[in-house]
Amino acid sequence: MTTAPRDSVVWKLAGLLRESGDAVLSGCSTLSLLTATLQQLNRVFELYLGPWGPGQTGFVALPSHPADSPVILQLQFLFDVLQKTLSLKLVHIPGVGLPGPIKIFPFKSLRQLELRGVPIHSLCGLRGIYSQLESLVCNRSIQALEELLSACGGDLCSALPWLALLSADFSYNALRSLDSSLRLLSALRFLNLSHNHLQDCKGFLMDLCELYHLDISYNHLRLVPRVGPSGAALGTLILRANELRSLQGLEQLKNLRHLDVAYNLLEGHTELAPLWLLAELRKLYLEGNPLWFHPAHRAATAQYLSPRARDAAHGFLLDGKVLSLKDLQQTSDSSGLGPVIQPLSWPVGSTTETSGGPELSDSLSSGGIVAQAPLRKVKSRVRVRRASISEPSDTDPELRTLDPSPAGWFVQQHRELELLASFRERFGCDWLQYRSHLETMGSSPLSTTKTPALSTPPLDVQNLETVCSPPAIEDDTKESPEKVSEEGRVEPEPQEEEREEQDKEEGSREDLEEEEEQEQKAVEAELCRPMLVCPLQGLGGVQGKECFLRVTSAHLFEVELQAARTLERLELQSLVAAELESETETQGEPVSEGSGPFPGAPVLVLRFSYICPDRQLRRYAVLEPEAREAVQELLAVLTPFTSVKEQQPGANKDPQGARFQCLRCSCEFKPEESRLGLESDEGWKPLFQNTESPVVCPNCGSDHVVLLAVSGEVPNREQNQEEQSADSACDLADHGGCPSRPDGIPPQTSISHDRSSWSLSPSPGCSGFRSVDHRLRLFLDVEVFSDSEEEFQCCIKVPVVLAGHTEEFPCLVVVSNHMLYLLKVLGAICGPPASWLQPTLAIALQDLSGMELGLAGQSLRLEWAAGTGSCVLLPRDARQCRAFLEELTGVLQSLPRTQRNCISATEEEVTPQHRLWPLLGKDPSAEVPQFFYLRAFLAEGSSTCPVSLLLTLSTLYLLDEDPGGSHAESPLPVVSDETSEQPASLGPGPSLQVREQQPLSCLSSVQLYRTSPLDLRLIFYDEVSRLESFWALHVVCGEQLTALLAWIREPWEELFSIGLRTVTQEALDLDR
């Protein structure tokens, strides 16, 4: 092996280290090796320089060898460098290399170790260096932490604490739970557990006393992880893309400065109450949560922030933007509607942290939150106290608490939460949209109370001022201080004022509750008698407390047996299915302790369409004496609600009518589009897992999607037009002929969904091209069509280039039963069509003499009058281009025989006379070489320009083409009955100019973007000039991007024998 030619792996590695060994030995550069290469080196070392015993540790001094042996000298040099290497990266490619252990024995001085896809059970030699490692990265290698931390991989030993380890990255693994091996990382400061399958961290992070940065994003956590001791050192916590519904537990992290809980399931701003105690917090990310869609989200969030954090000198960053003075003023206005006090803190440490309820003052801080100030004693003042007598009402379920103690506040907060919960249950998941409706009814539970931490933030300050304005009785009290002397001034007691206002708010709230109950009783009629049931919780059938089941015309209630309180209220309009559970399933369920079994009791199963998982399934064991008859009575009442839901418009399961919306990026898509997403990280998937989400957003990859409700009042035609406008990839305003957009992104990525917008770009298909807005149809009939017998057939909005011109312009191509019209789009598509459409050209269908489909089906060339005129349509989407050609061909075939011109469409062929042939191959006799052709857009700063991308097996070209060609271009041939059946190709073709070219070997990586799925960046690195460059491209559909990556990957990986690196970033940065 060592006597092989100098191009062997050993000689190449030795030569590389002789040139760049200083950077490796100093730790500035990382030595990256394939596991197969490391195995080969170990075999050579053991053969010529070893062998060494399994207990060999420390630096190895090599024996002397003859100096005239270049092989031995090369191996000695290589072994010495490996022993002194500080940073190592190992990459494992499945199926490459020899079976057996992967030994890292030669590396004696490692400080940083990175493992990518390395089977951890095959890694040997870690026990000799783990105590000196400062940074450890392990991706796509482990399923449990103890495999690496406790057993040291393939060494299978009992490891002691990793005393020097400061940073650990265990992202992109298959971790489902943590274990006690984390206690070995006592000095750890940075921990990354993102992109795993963790559901609960339990208490395994409590031993990491020095932890400062914790990243557990993209997991399945439902609770905030506990960090110890008391989270004193933690400064950054990233919990993005989990399943958090509450932030309880964050109040312990006193020094937290950066918190990221974006894309979770936080529904209300009341869940942000723990943020009040985080005085050092400076960055907060909440985007993608249900509360983020609140119209007053920023103002409502600022209400729950600590005054010290909100008023920081450098500004508080909320969702990446500084909290503005306007947000704080809105908070101040909303807080000024009623007395506001500091929210209660959780018992997280000492008793001093949870005390201080009665000593809170009424003065507001600059940000609208009350500042706590000590009470002053004024001896010269005479306080006149008014008696506050409050008797319990007969309708109150329990006595009202007047004591201004924490217990009294808790009761008030609890009542407010119940009222808010009833409001949300009434309106479902879209409860924020009914805010104005609720306020006009006067039953809004969103009135501001004394405790902003556990109350809903004000939605509309102007509306709430009318609801929560103080009574006119207080005017008398304002006049009394003017009638007394300065020394004997009358001043009400602060606590008495709070008590009175609390009484009034509670009284008004109880009145609203009574009115709601009366309205409910008056409107909703009982559909059957109450049934005695026992709820069965979960799939295990754990028995709950017995209750009555009431069914009204709109709701289903669970009512307590003794106090007759409503335990649960479910909407019948959300009922999906009502069925009787089979006896075999019921007999196999366990019974909880303390609750006797119900042998033979039938089980009623109800399924609802709520988003919350706890409310989707209800199972009741019917305990009536005649249980079978009672169940049949319930089914007879509930089944009509499920059948009505199935008959509603949009409730069918037709995949063509259903649409989803992503909660992260608000993108709307069809079910079939969710399977077209790119796997940009395909080369780095776990070797032992291949999972796929059933419904994911094709734009950002999130699985937090909801099914949009289809309104039955919208006509199908209008709905189809809106979907076609959203799905089309050809809603192009202008490129080349008109100024580009300032953001540099082609306009087809920004499509309006306004009701007043025009739908001009239907999706491929006959029904799509034939549907048109009725206003546009009227304009065509009156202003464009010249013959009274002329009828509209189809249309498409597409960029067009006329013969003899180089710039393309947006155009509406309209086909009637006699003519083909080109209507130039002058500007914004709004208002009367005459203001933004200009008739440019009219061609009789019988004059068409040729139709040619361009390369890869991305353009369509039309000729008329025997080649005297021509134009090129540039949809750039092969599927849409072929669909329109098929539609146009059908119109031509439907012409009368006297007007029918026997022409058929041809496809552009690559021959030795083709314009691309010099770039593909110089041998005219050779077959057509393999290539990939794509029409796209090149982003240059803030503007874009149309280009063509040509890929061969060795070179990448950026081309500037003139689609219109010159006047001397040969016409398209006419294929008639007398001519040959073999279609002739186009002549010399459009002019061509190479803008830029790069060899395939210089391609280093491909960069994609989650929020811009149609943009990509090809990054090149020239090893000779050591310069890096890139091509920022934009395609018109996701299929083109997928095909482009697939075509590049095969020859590139064959050239380098490793996977092509694709990097996915969150957003497109136009400044780079």
Swiss-Prot record:
| Annotated region described as Disordered, given as residue ranges | 333-366, 441-522, 741-762, 967-993
Where is composition skewed (Basic and acidic residues) in this entry?
478-492, 501-510
From the UniProt record, which GO molecular function terms apply? protein kinase binding
Q: Does the keyword Metal-binding apply?
A: no
Where does it reside?
Cytoplasm
Q: What processes in GO biological process is this protein linked to?
A: protein localization
Q: Name the family.
A: Belongs to the STK11IP family.
Role description: May regulate STK11/LKB1 function by controlling its subcellular localization.
Q: What is this protein called?
A: Serine/threonine-protein kinase 11-interacting protein
Q: Which organism is it from?
A: Mus musculus
Tell me the gene name: Stk11ip
